[in-house]
Amino acid sequence: MAKKYIDTGKKDTRGGFGAGLYEAGKKDPRIVAMTADLIGSLKMDAFAKEFPDRFVQCGIAEANMIGAAAGLAVTGKIPFVGSFAEFVTGRVYDQIRQEVAYGHTNVKIASSHAGITLGEDGVFAFADCCRHYEGQGSFDLFLRQV
């Protein structure tokens, strides 16, 4: 049986991010949005539709996305990049350190799906602390929540 959720009337964090990004994009033409094949998961749809020339779909290539964002920032753009928390904290640490932090580039990094409650977008995005590698790992944890 599917878990029932109570509608509190509050916006979800990723919905707030998408709405805020869209509003900021209307005010500042330097803003560029980039994602690693997660436009729907991060609610970037409205920005991509309204500003297609300022939206970059990078595919499943978070490291390349961070490098491209740093390059855009050097040219005066303000890139907002988005991916799952597991990937922007673990998979791209070197790129963030070398290309964003050391260079003091103006790159904004947003992430979502930090816990284990958004299983509908895939359990592969769960943090390593929520996995075990002998069996099904994250999938086992997800099923226990249902």
Language-model features: locations:
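Thiamine diphosphate
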Residues: M1-V146
